[in-house]
């Protein structure tokens, strides 16, 4: 359905922050500060016990032995968290399969296509190297259910009875399972509908998980592959590279004369593209390009694309012009996927580059998104710049404001009064949105307006009010 107006959901409706430890994308924090090896061990203990209890209820597994796949990104701390999780899981009787350095979507793929009870990805996605996170994936390859997260948090806070240890031969086993990652690479290659021969493609792997996978895929499909930022050292993940520092890829594409470029984040669940001229093609534009193509080929289920409230107003105008319906959800690919599952929609995503193709995946997948963009370019025999030019993007400025307390900062009457003032100023020509980050002590202030200068001015007005009332760190 097409939602009226350009403000989408109300601010209260869009804020979905889970609990004390788990945010919109798992348990994330600075390593050894607010995410510790003790936390990881206890998460492992709980998951091994929880899925073991579920397994006991099945006729073919009376011993309650569950199977858990673990992947990690390239941060130095990922290894210590992996060891802690393995210790907790096996102490509770779970068998653990190590995928090693791999992407979040690969863990999801392995779990949902094999007999795993759950999967864990150790990553803080686009965050700096000193942060890390624990993402838990259920047996269907989806983000973990919120009721289970509540129980994990209760255990972390000591509100549950102590979990018994597995003894003797009930102690879990640990297995090297790099073969699972390799099977995922083969799956990605099988999705491509055409050879990429003759195409010069640049990949920015963010010195992260994509470094282990992306080049293999594009080389196998015949592309002339140029890879940058694929030498991780544990400390350089996302540092001046990848999807959050897209200018690096823009310059490289222009200098090297590539036909297209793709930038990933630390765990490669998102993708931002760069066209042949070095212009950015973000998640909104990718949704339009793929959505229009899927409508033309009769593969856009329900004739609907699922977006979030952060998507640009220009995207909705383009969808309206093409007769494509859309849904708006809270920010987070978790909520995009929930909508897709509930209503049977097959394409959804975020401006940040989390794109979900439900025919192939249950979570955002940066490398898969690259393949789908290549498919449209090849099938339509068009450059990416030409495909993206059909959308007139409204200027948008978003600033992340680090604050002492997210809720207090956003709900402050003075801040809300300033938001109302900006809303009145913009009228029907734009919008303002305040949103609390689900993973950081940050309030995001976003304005869309006729000019970038006006966006900057209005965003800064709101931030100044936050500063004046003592909210900003």
Predicted segments with their positions:
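Gly/Ser/Thr-enriched, mixed-charge loops and adjacent short helices
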Residues: 30, 132-256
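Proline/glycine-rich low-complexity loops and linkers
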Residues: 150-185, 190, 276-349, 356-357
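Short glycine-centered, acidic/aromatic-flanked micro-motifs in structured strand/loop junctions
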Residues: 71-72, 203-205, 275, 359, ...
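N-terminal small/polar loop signature for handling phosphorylated ligands or for N-terminal nucleophile
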Residues: 57, 67-131, 216-274
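Phosphate-binding and adjacent anionic-ligand microenvironments
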Residues: 260, 297-473
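An N-terminal, well-structured beta->alpha segment
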Residues: 11-87, 91-92, 174-200, 407-411
């Amino acid at each position: 359905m097409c939602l009226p107006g350009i403000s989408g959901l109300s601010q209260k409706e869009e804020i979905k922050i889970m609990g004390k430890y788990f945010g919109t994308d798992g348990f994330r924090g600075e390593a050894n500060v607010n995410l510790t090896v003790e936390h990881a061990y206890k998460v492992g203990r709980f998951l091994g016990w929880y899925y073991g209890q579920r397994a006991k209820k099945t006729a073919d597994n009376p011993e309650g032995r569950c199977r858990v796949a673990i992947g990690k990104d390239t941060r130095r701390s990922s290894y210590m968290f992996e060891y802690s999780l393995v210790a907790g899981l096996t102490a509770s009787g779970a068998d653990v399969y190590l995928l090693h350095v791999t992407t979040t979507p690969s863990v999801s793929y392995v779990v949902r296509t094999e007999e795993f009870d759950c999967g864990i990805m150790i990553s803080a996605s686009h965050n700096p190297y000193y942060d890390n996170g624990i993402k838990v994936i259920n047996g269907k390859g989806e983000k973990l259910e919120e009721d289970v997260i509540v129980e994990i948090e209760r255990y972390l806070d000591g509100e549950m009875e102590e979990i018994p240890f597995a003894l003797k031969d009930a102690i879990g086993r640990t297995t090297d399972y790099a073969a699972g990652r390799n099977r995922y690479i083969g799956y990605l290659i099988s999705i491509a509908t055409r050879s990429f021969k003759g195409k010069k493609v640049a990949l920015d792997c963010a010195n992260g998980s994509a470094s282990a996978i992306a080049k293999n895929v594009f080389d196998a499909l015949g592309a002339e592959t140029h890879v940058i930022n694929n030498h991780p050292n544990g400390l350089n993940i996302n540092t001046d590279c990848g999807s959050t520092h897209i200018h690096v890829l823009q310059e490289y594409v222009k200098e090297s004369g590539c036909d297209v470029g793709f930038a990933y984040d630390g765990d490669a669940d998102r993708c931002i593209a760069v066209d042949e001229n070095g212009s950015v093609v973000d998640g909104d534009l990718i949704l339009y390009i793929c959505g229009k193509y899927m409508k033309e080929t009769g593969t856009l289920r329900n004739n609907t694309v699922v977006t979030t409230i952060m998507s640009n107003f220009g995207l909705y105008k383009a969808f309206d012009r093409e007769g494509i319906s859309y849904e708006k959800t809270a920010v987070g690919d978790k909520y995009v996927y929930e909508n897709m599952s509930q209503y049977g929609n097959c394409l959804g995503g975020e401006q940040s580059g989390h794109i979900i193709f439900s025919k192939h995946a249950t979570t955002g997948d940066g490398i898969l998104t690259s393949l789908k963009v290549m498919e449209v370019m090849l099938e339509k025999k068009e450059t990416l710049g030409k495909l993206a030019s059909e959308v007139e993007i409204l200027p948008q400025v978003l600033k992340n404001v680090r604050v002492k307390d997210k809720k207090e900062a956003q709900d402050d009457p003075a801040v809300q009064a300033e938001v109302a003032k900006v809303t009145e100023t913009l009228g029907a020509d734009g919008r303002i949105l305040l949103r609390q980050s689900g993973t950081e002590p940050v309030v995001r202030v976003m304005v869309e307006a006729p000019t970038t200068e006006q966006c900057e001015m209005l965003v800064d007005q709101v931030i100044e009010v936050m500063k004046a009332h003592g909210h900003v760190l």
